[in-house]
C-alpha cells in the first residue's frame, strides 16, 4: 500500500489547478506574461550547437531555464519545480483540449519523438546480441518490463528535449546554451529492452516519414567517452535512481538487484570485483538522487538546506549497510543463489542508453513558437515538475537484471516499432507524470535492504544450526558405539575373572577336603596310640614322653582347628566372591539395557533430525510460495497502477473547475495530516513502551548471557542512530515541506483570485467544465471513502501487532525465568555428579586395595597350608619313631626284668652254694689242697673276670640289649666263681653308660621343646594375622553394599543429568526462537516508525 499517501491529494489538486489555469488561458487567449523558452525546440544539426547529451538526468539541461528564458519566467518555474508533486501531467491530452486548440498548436505539442541510439562503447559482440534478442523476446514477463521501460524512456526523453530547447533568440544566446550543454557530464540512463529498435512517438498523429527522418538524424549523434564513465565502470548493473514514490515491492526489487548481482558475479569472478560493482551501483544511485534533488530546485533560495536534507535522507550509512550486506551475501552464496534462481529465470533483460533527440526540425519549431507563444507561457509552469516526475519514474522502473544475459544494443532502424509503441508510451507518460516524489522512500530502500539481509542471515543461521545439530548427533552416535565396545570388553574381562575364580574355588575345596581327611586319620591314630599306651605299664620316662606327645598332639589339634576355621573363612570368602560375580553379571545386564536405551535414543534423535530436515524443506517451499506471492502482488500493483492511470485520465477531463474541489481537498489534507500526526504519536508511544520493555528484558538477559546481549545492544544502538538520523531528516523535510506549502498556498490564493476574475468573464464555453467538476467531486468522494477503509484496516493491523508484541514479551520473560531455574538445577546436579564421581573413584581405589589384600591372604594361606603339610609329615615321622622307641624300650624293660630275676635266683643259689662250700672246706683238713685249689680258683676267677669284662664290652658295643643277659650269666658265673668285686665294678660301668644315654636323650628332648616353642610362636603370629584378615573380610560385604548404593545413586544421577540436559537444550532452543522472534518484531517496529 505504499502508493497510498495523503500528500497525493494536495499535489493532485495543485497540478489540476495549474493545468486548469493553463487551459483557461489558452481558451480565452489571455496574454498576461511574455512567452518563455521551455517548449521551444532547438534545431538539430545547427552549426555551433552540440547535440544534447544522451541519457541521464542532466543538471545543466535542467538549469537552462535560468539562462534562456525571459525575466518573468524563473519565479514561475521555481514555484513549479519546488512543489512536491506526486503525480504530474506532461502530455497535452488530445481527447478534451484539442477542441480548444488550433491545428498548429496541436502539431507543435504532439511532435516530440525520441530515438534510442547504441552507445559508442559496446561490450558484447553482435552475435551475442542476436542470441540475447531471441532469448529475451520469449517470456511474457520481459515484455511487460520492456513496455514499462519504453514508456519511462519516452517520458524522460520527451521532457528533457522540451526542457533543453531554448527559444530562437540571437545567436550569442544559442552559443551560450550550446556551451552549457557540451559541458554536461551525466551518467547514462540504461533501459531494459528485448528489441533492437526503440523508436517511440508521444502521439498517434505523427506520420511514419517524419519518424524515419528523425531516426536518420539521430544516427549521426555520438556519445563522448567521458559521458559513459559510469556505464563502462558498471556494465552489468543498472544504476537505479532513487524514486520517492516507488513502493515497498519495487524498492525491494531494486535492492535485490545488488544482492543477486553480487552473488552471481561472485560465482563467475572474484568477490573483490563484485563488491566494487555493488559500490559503483550505489554511487550511481546516490549521484542520481542528488541530481534529481538539485534539478528540482535550481532557483530555490534555500538550496543548501535542500542538499543537506537529501544528504540526510540518503546518508552514507545506508549505502555502507547495503554494501556490507552485499559482501555478506557472498558467504551465504547458496541461499542467495536459490533466491536469485527463483526470481531471475525466464527473464531476458538488456540495457540500452537513451539519446535525447530534438523534438522537431528547426523550421517547424520556429513556426510553432511564433504561433503559440501564449500557449508555451502556460506550459512553462508544468514542464519542470513533469520532468522531475518522469525522472523519478525512470528511476523507479529499474528492476533486477540478470547479469548472465548480454547487453543488447538498440539500433535506430525499423521505424514501424515507433508506431506500435507510441500508444502505450503516451499512457505511460501520463502515468509517470502523476508519479509523486517522496524523499522518505529512500528510507524504505534501506529498510527493505535490511529486511532482506536479515532474511538471508536467518536462513544461514538455520542452516548452520541444523548442520551443528547433525554433527552433534553423529558425535553422540560414535560415543555410544565406543561405549558399547567398552561394555563388551568389560563383560569379556568379567567372564574371564569369573572362570579364574571358579577354578581357584575348586582347588581350595579340594585342598580343604584333603586336609579334613588327614585330620581324621591323625585323630584315629591318636586314639589308637592312647589306647595302646593305656593298656601298657606306666613308667616315669614313658609317662613324661606321653605327656610331651599329648601336648604336641594338643598343639597340632589346636592348629588343625585354627586351620579349619581359616578354611571355613576362606569358604565364606568364596561364597561372597560368587555373590559378587552375580552382582557383576547384573551390572553387565544393566549396562546392556543402558546400551539398548542409548540405541533407542539415537534412533529417536535420527527421527528428530529427519523431522528437522522436513521442516527445512517446508521452509524452503514457504519461501518459494512467498516469492510467488510477492510477484503476484507486484502484478496486482501494476494492475492497480493501470487502474489509477485510467482514473487519472478520467479526472483530467475535470481539470478546469477546481474551486469546490480545492476546498474539499484542503479539508481532507488537514484531516489526513491530523491522522498522520496521531498515527505517528501512537507509533512513538508504542515504540517507547517497546523500548522500555526491551530495556527490561535486555537487563535480565545481560545477567544470563552477556555475550549474546552485547551484540544485541550494539544492533539496538545502530538502529537508534539510524532512527535519530531518520527523525532529523524527517524534521528537516517537514520544515522544507511547510515552507513549500506556504509558498504553494500563496500561489493558490493568487490563482483563486485570478480564477474569480476569469470566471466572471468566462463565456458559455466553460459550462461543460462545470459538469466535469461535479463528476470530479463524485470521484473524490468515492476515493475518500476507500482511503478511510484503508486507514481503518491499517489501524486494526497496528493494534494486532501491539498485542502480538506484548504476548511475545511475556513469553520471553517466562522463557528467561525458566532458563535461569534450569541453569541453577544443572549447576547443582553437576556439583552432585562431580562429588559422586570422586566418591566412586575413591571406592574403586579401596576395592582394588582390598582385592590386592585378598590376593596376598590367599598366597599366605597357600603357603601356610604347605607348611601345615610339612608339619604333619614331621609329626607322622616323629610318631613312628616314638612308636619304635617305645617298642624297643618295652622289650629292653622286659629283658632287664628277666635278667634281674635271674640274677636274684643266681645270687640266692650262689649264696647257698657258698655256704655249703664253707661247710665242706671247714670239714676237709688238708691245707695244701686248699691252697692249691684256692690258687687255682683265683686264677680261674681272674680269667673268668677278664673274659667277662671283654665279653661285656663287646656285647655293649655290638648287640646292646643282649649285653644284660650275657653279663648276667657271666656275673652269675663270676659270682659263682667268687669274683664279687669285679661284678660290682662291671655294674657301675653299665650304670654310667645308661646315664650317658639318658643325658643324650634329654638333650634331644630339649631341642624338640625349642622347636615346639618356635612353631607355637609362628602359630600365634599366623593366628593373629588370620584374625586380622577375618576382620577385614567381614568389612568387605559392607563395602560391597556401599558400592552398590553408590552405583545406584550414580546411575540415577546420570539419568537425572541426562533429562536435565535435554530440558536445558530444549529451553535453549526455545529461547533462541523467542530471541529471533523478538528481533524480527523489533525490526518491524523500527520499520513502521521509519515509514
Swiss-Prot record:
What is the phylogenetic placement of the source species in the record? Eukaryota, Metazoa, Chordata, Craniata, Vertebrata
Q: Where is region (Interaction with Elongin BC complex) located?
A: 329-338
Which terms does the record give in the GO molecular function aspect? Answer: DNA binding; nuclear androgen receptor binding; transcription coactivator activity
Q: Which residues form a coiled coil?
A: 443-767, 824-894, 984-1090
Point out residues bearing the modification Phosphothreonine: 927
Its localization reads: Cytoplasm; Nucleus; Golgi apparatus membrane
Q: Name one GO cellular component term.
A: Golgi apparatus
Residue spans of biased composition, Basic and acidic residues class: 217-234
Q: Which gene encodes it?
A: Tmf1
Q: Which GO terms describe its biological process?
A: acrosome assembly; androgen receptor signaling pathway; apoptotic process; defense response to bacterium; epithelial cell apoptotic process; flagellated sperm motility; Leydig cell differentiation; luteinizing hormone secretion
UniProt lists compositionally biased (Polar residues) regions at 57-81
Q: What is its main location?
A: cytoplasm
Q: How is it modified after translation?
A: Phosphorylated by FER.
Question: What keywords tag this UniProt record?
Answer: Coiled coil, Cytoplasm, DNA-binding, Golgi apparatus, Membrane, Nucleus, Phosphoprotein, Repressor, Transcription, Transcription regulation
Q: What Pfam families does UniProt report for this protein, alphabetically?
A: TMF_DNA_bd, TMF_TATA_bd
Domain of life, per the record?
Eukaryota
Residues with Phosphoserine modification:
73, 78, 112, 136, 213, 324, 326, 329, 334, 340, 357, 411, 540, 923, 926, 931
Q: What this chain does, per the record? A: Potential coactivator of the androgen receptor. May play critical roles in two RAB6-dependent retrograde transport processes: one from endosomes to the Golgi and the other from the Golgi to the ER. Mediates STAT3 degradation.
User: What information about domains appears in the record's comments?
Assistant: The Elongin BC complex binding domain is also known as BC-box with the consensus [APST]-L-x(3)-C-x(3)-[AILV].
Q: Which segments show compositional bias classed as Acidic residues?
A: 368-379
Protein name (database record): TATA element modulatory factor
- Bias (Low complexity) occurs at 111-122, 131-142, 194-211, 242-253, 264-273
Q: How does it assemble?
A: Component of the SNF/SWI transcription factor complexes. Interacts with RAB6A. Interacts with TCEB1. Interacts with STAT3 and FER. Interacts with TRNP1; may regulate TRNP1 proteasomal degradation.
Q: Where is this region: Disordered?
A: 42-86, 100-280, 360-443
